[in-house]
From Swiss-Prot, chain A:
Disulfide bonds: C75-C84, C117-C126
Protein name: Calvin cycle protein CP12-2, chloroplastic
Primary localisation category: plastid
Further comment: Binds copper and nickel ions. Copper ions catalyze the oxidation of reduced thiol groups and thus promote formation of the disulfide bonds required for linker activity.
Biological process per Gene Ontology, one example term: cellular response to cold
PTM comment text: Contains two disulfide bonds; only the oxidized protein, with two disulfide bonds, is active in complex formation. The C-terminal disulfide is involved in the interaction with GAPDH and the N-terminal disulfide mediates the binding of PRK with this binary complex.
Organism: Arabidopsis thaliana (Mouse-ear cress)
Lineage start: Eukaryota, Viridiplantae, Streptophyta, Embryophyta, Tracheophyta
Pfam families: CP12
Curated annotation (Swiss-Prot), chain B:
EC number, as in UniProt: 2.7.1.19
PROSITE patterns: PHOSPHORIBULOKINASE (PS00567)
SUPFAM superfamilies linked: P-loop containing nucleoside triphosphate hydrolases (SSF52540)
Cellular compartments annotated: Plastid, Chloroplast
Activity control summary: Light regulated via thioredoxin by reversible oxidation/reduction of sulfhydryl/disulfide groups.
Protein name: Phosphoribulokinase, chloroplastic
UniProt main location, coarse: plastid
Similarity comment: Belongs to the phosphoribulokinase family.
Domain of life of the source: Eukaryota
Enzyme class: transferase
PANTHER family per UniProt: URIDINE KINASE
Length: 131, 395
């Protein structure tokens, strides 16, 4: 898996084609930048910088699938170990995120204009007239 | 001389203040009288009060049905912050801000893997920062809150949160840290039984490629020790607990479609009067199905009784089964008291308004709506009480 240097900011919103030949939109731009303005924080926190994995092909569904396989492999030996529990916790978190992404796509109706107009109702493109 | 005051909702949320006091804002108005050219200074103090509500739940942070019902009762739809991080977990409406406590993870996903801990473990959460920021918001001070990105598993740049009228902190640990617990004006624990949790996660996850019954079960079982150690004990501190259990109306039911929901309400909580059915403090068992309420199998059954919960006196209101027709809910509502409704039928109206929400035909929707009304009532009582206290202090 390719890694990207810390601090490099990539925001991407692309359409991926999954193995079922369905276009899958990411829930939103994926911000990979993990640096922020430390001066604005109210407390000092030691942040260990580490490489960031690139946005995977296929969106979050593939990430869920990978994490399930990884959890099953990690837990094959010792199902009550810390590694095993943390692995399944990741599955749970990613499954919830995937569920939210599905709900959001369903609610938005996959219409980019509606999504844009929700955030920018005052623009010319989004004006509607009752008469 | 009467002076009219015009200010927008945004002004009420402003953090700008003219005095050192952080709990009040002062607006200077100038009025020119037509007869004379003298100007009068009128001083009006607008008090910005924030109440803090804690909601403990296993998952579904920030986007849950409960949050949407709650913010609907308070007025306005809650939405992610405009122009902000699209992966933000925060929801904001005119009166309410919902903060996801996952944003106070001290370890991101990769840190947790390295440390071999789950997100439920207190070692993966920064309770010092959580306490400082919730306290600041309660005192009317804006904060730069971190954002935990559930998609990438990393901590994103922070977002600015303005103090709202009602602040809801939702997540795994709203009542875990004693300092945070003491900041809460009201707290709720969603207690989902293992059977219902399993059924709901099947419904959620079987649509996802890679998941199976085995993986869902393994995921729940792996998290259970940490859940029992760090999450479940919080329910002893909750002012209200919503217990979701399988129905007892269908023998040996294992589908999880029909639910029995119990609303456990603590007695003696300030500004909170428990809801009751028929007579306060009595013991009621009621099957409302008949001419006024249409029911199909397995029907509906209500229970109401005083009880003890973790050595605390409580009132328990229970609904088993589901409604066939939501408009007939008014009949049930008319037999409940202390609902804190502003008009007859407000509960039914709220339920009909969100008939498409999950759980609208069972006790989860009904009790979530009722809790929303109680929180609104608590907010109004608290504001009125503080206004009275300030008036007395001036005298």
């Amino acid at each position: 898996m390719a890694t990207i240097a810390t601090g490099l900011n990539i925001a991407t919103q692309r359409v991926f084609v999954t193995s079922e030949n369905r276009p899958v939109c990411l829930a939103g731009p994926v911000h990979l930048n993990n640096s922020w303005n430390l001066g604005s924080r109210t407390t000092n926190r030691m942040m260990k910088l580490q490489p960031i994995k690139a946005a995977p092909e296929g969106g979050i569904s593939d990430v869920v699938e990978k994490s399930i396989k990884e959890a099953q492999e990690t837990c094959a030996g010792d199902p009550v170990s810390g590694e095993c529990v943390a692995a399944w916790d990741e599955v749970e978190e990613l499954s919830a995120a995937a569920s939210h992404a599905r709900d959001k796509k369903k609610a938005d109706g996959s219409d980019p204009l509606e999504e844009y107009c929700k955030d920018n109702p005052e623009t010319n493109e989004c004006r509607t007239y009752d008469n | 001389m009467a002076v009219s005051t015009i200010y927008s909702t945004q002004a009420l949320n402003s953090t700008h203040f003219l005095t050192s006091s952080s709990s009040s804002k002062q607006v200077f108005l100038y009025r020119r009288q037509p007869q004379t050219n003298r100007r009068f200074n009128t001083l009006i103090t607008c008090a910005q009060e924030t109440i803090v509500i804690g909601l403990a739940a296993d998952s579904g942070c920030g986007k849950s049905t409960f949050m949407r019902r709650l913010t609907s009762v308070f007025g306005g739809a809650a939405k992610p912050p405009k122009g902000g991080n699209p992966d933000s977990n925060t929801l904001i409406s005119d009166t309410t801000t919902v903060i996801c406590l996952d944003d106070y993870h001290s370890l991101d996903r990769y840190g947790r893997k390295e440390q071999k801990v789950t997100a439920l473990d207190p070692r993966a959460n920064d309770f010092d920062l959580m306490y400082e920021q919730v306290k600041a918001l309660k005192n009317g001070i804006a904060v730069e809150k971190p954002i935990y990105n559930h998609v990438t598993g990393l901590l994103d740049p922070p977002e600015l949160i303005q103090p709202p009228k009602i602040l809801v902190i939702e997540g795994l640990h709203p009542m875990f840290d004693e300092r945070v617990r003491d900041l809460l004006d009201f707290s709720i624990y969603l207690d989902i039984s293992n059977e219902v949790k399993f059924a709901w996660k099947i419904q959620r996850d079987m649509a996802e490629r890679g998941h199976s019954l085995e993986s869902i079960k393994a995921s729940i079982e792996a998290r259970k020790p940490d859940f029992d150690a760090f999450i479940d004990p919080q329910k002893q501190y909750a002012d209200a607990v919503i217990e979701v259990l399988p129905t007892t109306l269908i023998p040996d039911d294992n589908e999880g479609k029909v639910l029995r929901v119990r609303l456990i309400m603590k007695e003696g909580v300030k500004y909170f009067s428990p809801v009751y059915l028929f007579d306060e403090g009595s013991t009621i068992s009621w099957i409302p199905c008949g001419r006024k309420l249409t029911c199909s199998y397995p029907g509906i059954k209500f229970n109401y009784e005083p009880d003890s919960y973790f050595d605390h006196e409580v009132s328990v209101l229970e609904m088993d089964g589901q409604f066939d027709r939501l408009d007939e809910l008014i009949y049930v509502e008319s037999h409940l008291s202390n609902l804190s409704t502003k008009f007859y039928g407000e509960v039914t109206q709220q339920m009909l308004k969100h008939a498409d929400f999950p759980g609208s035909n069972n006790g989860t929707g009904l009790f979530q709506t009722i809790v929303g009304l109680k929180i609104r009532d608590l907010y109004e009582q608290l504001i009125a009480n503080k206004a009275t206290a300030r008036a007395e202090a001036k005298a």
